[in-house]
Amino acid sequence: ILGTILGLLKGL
């Protein structure tokens, strides 16, 4: 889901 992608970006 989009939430997962956003989570990865925040992890960077």
From Swiss-Prot:
Family: Belongs to the MCD family. Protonectin subfamily.
Claim: Disulfide bond is one of the keywords in the record: no
GO biological process, one term: innate immune response
Keyword Secreted carried by entry: yes
Record localization: Secreted; Target cell membrane
Modified-residue entries (Leucine amide), positions: L6, L12
Protein name, UniProt field: Protonectin
Organism: Agelaia pallipes pallipes (Neotropical social wasp)
Short sequence motif Dimerization motif 1: positions: 3-7
Motif (Dimerization motif 2): 7-11
Any single GO CC term annotated in Swiss-Prot or TrEMBL for this entry: membrane
Keywords: Amidation, Antibiotic, Antimicrobial, Chemotaxis, Fungicide, G-protein coupled receptor impairing toxin, Immunity, Innate immunity, Mast cell degranulation, Membrane, Repeat, Secreted, Target cell membrane, Target membrane, Toxin
A GO molecular-function annotation: toxin activity
Note: Two derivatives of protonectin with substitutions of all the amino acid residues (D-prt) or the Lys residue (D-Lys-prt) with the corresponding D-amino acids have been synthesized. Both derivatives D-prt and D-Lys-prt exhibit strong antimicrobial activity against bacteria and fungi, and both of them could disrupt the integrity of membrane and lead the cell death. D-prt has similar hemolytic activity than protonectin, while D-Lys-prt has significantly lower activity.
Tissue: Expressed by the venom gland.
